[in-house]
Amino acid sequence: MNVSFITQYTSSIDADAAILLQVEKFEKTFGLELVDPNRIIKKGYLIENFQGSFGSQIKFLYLEGSPFAFVKVVGLGKEQSINDETWLKAGGLCVSEIKNYPKKVVVFADALGIDVSTTQIMNFVLGALLKQYSFECYYTDKKKSKQKNKNILELVIITKNAENCQKELKQVQAICEGVNLTKELVNEPANILGTEEFVEKIKKLEKLNVKVQVLDKEKLKELGMNALLSVAQGSSRPPYLVIMQWNGSDNKEEEPLAFVGKGVVFDSGGISIKHSSGMEDMKADMGGAGTVVGLMHTLATRKAKINVTGVVGLVENMPSCHAQRPGDIVTSMSGQTIEVINTDAEGRMVLADVLWYCKTKIQPKLIVDLATLTGAIRIALGEQHAGLFSNNEALAKQIIKSGEATSEKVWQLPLGLEYDKLIDSKFADMKNSSGGSAGSITAAQFLKRFVDEKTPWAHIDIAAVCMGNKLNEFNNSWASGFGVRLLNYLIKNYYEQK
């Protein structure tokens, strides 16, 4: 979908549809006189008792005297409640449910009754762009399509901030591309996206000047990454460690920020096999890696002025005569030994070695890891927040604020010695599962043993927000693409060169 910005409407635009935005109970609507010279819409307001509450909509076809065949008015809600998230959702709402009508849509964006900023307009555009994505490539019957806005080819935004918005457009498009790439990776079935196929997807980033390094099984053995390898040994699919480098800083030698992703392309649970109910969702157990790849795409596309390294560990966790067993003890890359209590607590085994590699080989300024790590995080926080754990309060606060700014919210949970002792083992340095309460916390506590206090580190458990959520105002997809927008905001607003 093409997007453009203008300061005022002219008949030469020749659009099929118009969208107006209404602040709740405010008397006037920007663009109403032009769109509806015969004042029919106002009568519709009265008949339908339309007042502009958030998400409310009223639609009109072929209004007499109107230059548009289709007109929709969307409510923004009460003035004091309108924020950046409102505009993100409004963008998705505005392009929804208008199939069969427009090819070109004009949006009168400067809603009367409030001061509309460039940031809010760009959130609106992002919401509209994100809403366009759907994963329907495996339908042979195209009538099953749930996408209701495929016909929109061009979105024309009318705003006094047109010039500034045009300057920001490429940034927003880059974010959308990264989110959609993450969604695509998470949505793909595991028979299509195995470890080797995932590597090939990542290599496409090289076209954007991202340096990609792939370490295979033999190299992982040389490095002593036995925790990661132990997870992979039950599958015929080979394990990989993939390092992605974007050097956008003026100082190419500057310490990078590092983002680590869990990439279990399918998680059966291994010998500690999962229940069959819902196991199909475990194709998304590579969601953390998917987010890191999407983030790297966004940073490279918008040419971020910073050095960033993404590292993902790719494995498949399957039961077989070669699979690891409960009771096995493995020596991680760090030299610390791990007793395997539960083969379904595999993500932390992968991350243990990846985090240690990141800390010792890359030596970054900070590390943020993302993983669909625990089912317990859904019990603790539901689907509204990801879980956040950190050894650095300044970094944690930055991530929390970034989540609030992008509507990808996180909630910080505690770490401490009381939890750490729960993963002590009778036979090794630690065990991979405490087997009791505080499952998300003890999993994070396990990861903490593979980073040090000198390096700011944060772990984001995205198991409840990565996939399977209810569709919302700006997402049509089973996969949410969670994390790309949050981390891009974190980088741009707290670390990137201005």
Curated annotation (Swiss-Prot):
EC code(s) of this entry: 3.4.11.1, 3.4.11.10
Pfam families named in the record: Peptidase_M17, Peptidase_M17_N
Textual note on the cofactor: Binds 2 manganese ions per subunit.
Active site residues of this protein: 274, 348
Entry-linked CDD domains: Peptidase_M17
Statement: the UniProt record of this protein carries the keyword Protease: yes
Stated name of the protein: Probable cytosol aminopeptidase
Organism, scientific name: Phytoplasma mali (strain AT)
